[in-house]
Amino acid sequence: FELLRQHKNVLMIDTDLEAPGLSTFFFPADDEGLINKGTVDYLQLKNMDKNAVIDMTEYIIPLISPSYIDSDMGKLYLVSGGQLNDEFLLKLARIDTQELNGEKLKALFIQLLKDCCSALESDGGIDYILIDSRAGFHDMAGIVTAQLPHGVVLFGKDSFQSWFGIQQAVRTIATSQTDKPFAIIVDSGCGFNGLVSEEEKDNFRAKSYEIFCTNYYDNDIQPGLNAHGEAHDPIFIRYSATLAGDIPLYDGKKVVELKKQLSDWSYKELTYRIMEQFGENPMGGSELNE
């Protein structure tokens, strides 16, 4: 939401096809009428016929509800995973059995991005594309996480399982492109009773520093442990019971509190960090130095 408050036009694409969920932030899960087609449909169709002419208005959903979009905000769009029904699983299975991997999969994702940008160009264009993906080990996750983006935001916790996944993701990010993407790490859902102790912060930062020094930073250019704004420098998003379950922004009874929680300083800091990587000076960004 902070990007929208910065008057940026944002496109979200759900590529976590094993557990697509971005659409459930904006529509009830059982309301299929609001979603026509999504990422799974695009990949299946383009894989069968790379020259297929696609009407992107069937894929791109303008999110315009006044319950979560104010009149002075940028524009928000969504390409969902697809309609979440039994047919979705069949489409996903077909993709998995069509030898859709490696460079072919990467080419289809690049074409999806191009088609989205072309479709929205006449409506003011897109400033940021946010791609939701799990940092897994299959081709789709590896391509979306490491080979396509200018930057990657990694969400994790201080646990063995989380650190193992983060380490693999950081290693992949550092070696998949000639110019490695920038990285931001987030300690998600941390703290107790709304507070994150200095000990907890220090422990997470130390482990993050170890992983980035070993797998991401060049040997001759390694920042200090407490260097601010570097890849290993965590953003701490406190645990919120309100955000721990479903986040139904379409629910008029809950949206005010949800928007309040999503306006917490940590989310602003994350947005400012992203914008600064692209040389932008966010409105209100001076707060970082206060």
Q: Language-model segments: which ranges?
A:
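A short helix-to-beta-strand connector/capping loop
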Residues: Y68-L78, G125, D179-P181, H228-D233
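C-terminal lobe/tail of nucleotide-utilizing enzymes
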Residues: T175-E290
